[in-house]
Structure formats: structure tokens, C-alpha cells
Amino acid sequence: DYQTRSNDNRIKVIPSAPPRGLIFDRNGVLLAENQPEFSLEIIPEQVTDLKKTVQELTTLLDLDPQNIPRLLDEARHTRKFNPLTLAEQLNEEQVAKFSVNQYRFPGCNIEAYLKRNYPYTDVLTHALGYVARINVKDLQQLEKDGKLNNYAATHDIGKQGVEKYYEDQLHGQAGYQEVEVNNKGRVLRTLKFQPPVAGQDLYLGIDIKLQKRAYELMQGRKGGILMMDPRDGSILAFVSAPSYDPNIFVRGVTSKEYAALLKDPNRPLINRISQGGYAPASTVKPLLAIMGLNEGAITPYYRYFGGPTFQIPGTARKFRDWRRGGH
């Protein structure tokens, strides 16, 4: 009898996500924070009929049916013992309703987690970027880089800007619980606990007061403002306009919202500072003059008439002066 009990029990490793590092401006003002949320998670190996279970939960909790094919697709590309998220940002009513019916859904649990939030919304979008749900492409890249296990309990990953560039520093180290469970999946005892290690906090060169002022100056315009400290090259403000609220990508952008951004003639998704290609215009003249003086090709008293057009020898393209008669 004891041998049978022992065989029916098994060891299970439950990963836990690390808190993502926070992002501050140069004066310690919080720019990217973590807020508590509740999600509904499913462990495929503990579910007899995954599709049926997902459909029943969607009906019971009045969830978005578009989540069904997405979760089934994720299940085909990840390990069966890793939890998959069916729904996030559950409200109190949904949490209570699931708790009453949880006995019907083995392998399904409500989990508390921290969700990224950007309190300054579209003021910092193109500088900070954003995090969003880990997709199949992300999973493949993580596996290729040997980082997949560290993301076993993580929902989001940096997609743009600072959030993407400093992903390794911000993410942290996953923790885990090693538990003994019975043949029904019930946890009998915890054998080992390794707490997660929070990601590193980042302090940017940006001054949020200057950032907000630059943002205000760009209202109703298209373009960008980049302010630098000439003493050390640090970025004080980084604004591309128009912008958008990155929080819609964190919670899961709808097809309607994304289509509106794509169709917007002002192209808010474009980072006009780092992605825009613009002719340097007259800003290149001091550079060329200094180069000429340095090489002895001209003197401080040299005068040059630019004319209405300029053509690089051996090329067909003509660059036109904004003034018809030239300078």
C-alpha cells in the first residue's frame, strides 16, 4: 500500500517569474512600474482535453474567444509542463466565479503577477518602448539563445526601445518550487524553494520635466526633439511625435486598435529620431567648413556660392537648394 502511494506521487517543478526591474529618470522619478494583476493559467500536461477546457472556461468567465486559437498554437510550440496564460487582467467577479468552479478544471489556476505600466503614457513611448506578450518567434529566439528556462513563468518581454535593449538586465532570474504532488496533481509538500531574483533597476539620462516640455512643444506636429548634455553625451529628452500609449500593447492590443495605428496618416508608430531618414540640410555646412580648414583646402576668408543645385561628380541625382536661386 505504501509502495503504491509512493508510485502515485511525483516531483514537480513550478517556476516563478522574477519582478521586472523598474525604470527611473535621472532624478529618480519612476517611469516604468509593475502593478499587480490576476491571470488564468493552464498546464497542458494536466488537462485531458485542452481545447474543450479552454472553450468551457471562455464561456464561464466571458473571455475573448480570440484567445482560444492563440493558446492552442502556443501549446504546440512549448513544453507541456510549462503554464500557458488563457486570460489576463481578470476582474474580481471572474476570479470569484473561477474559484467556485475550480474543481471542474484540473490543471487550471488563478495566478497573481506583476504587469508593466507606463504612468506617463505617450510622453515616453519612443524612448522607453514597451513590453508585450511573448510570442512564438520570441520563444524560438529564447530557445536559440539558451534562455528559455529563465522565461518559463514570464508572460512579457521587451519589444521596443529601452525595454528591449536592456531586456537581459531588466528581466532578472526565474525562481522555482520543487514540490511533491499526488496522482491528482495536488501539492503534498514543498521540497525546495528558490526565490526569483528581481531584474536590475535602470536610471536613464532623461529628465522627465524636460521630456514633458519637449512633448508639449511637439503637440500637433510631426518630428522629433533630442536634447543632449554636451558634457557627457547623455540624453536629456527623446521625443518623437506623434506618439501613442504603450500600455495598450502591455495589456494586449486589439486588432482594431492596431489597425488604427497602422492607418493613421501621421504614422505614430515611426520613431522619427532613430528610424526617420532626413537630409541634413545646412547643418552639414559647418562640418564641411571645418574639414576644409583642417586640410588647408580653404581659408577663413574663402567664399563659395552653392547655386540652386548640387550634383556629386559621377552621379545623376541633383540636390536642390530650398531657395530657388541658391546661397
Task: Give the location of each predicted region.
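Conserved catalytic neighborhood of penicillin-recognizing serine enzymes
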Residues: 267-273, 298-327
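Short, solvent-exposed beta-strand-terminating loops
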Residues: 236-251
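Surface-exposed acidic, glycine/proline-enriched linker/cap segments
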Residues: 251-275
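Hydrophobic (often cysteine-bearing) scaffold residues that line and stabilize catalytic clefts
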Residues: 20, 50, 158, 206, ...
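Active-site SXXK
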Residues: 28, 56, 98, 127, ...
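Membrane-proximal periplasmic segments of bacterial cell-envelope enzymes
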Residues: 1-187, 194-195, 220-224, 230, ...
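Active-site-adjacent helix/loop patches that line small-molecule binding or acyl-intermediate pockets
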Residues: 223-239, 282-287, 291, 303-310, ...
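A conserved hydrophobic secondary-structure block that centers on an alpha-helix together
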Residues: 188-234
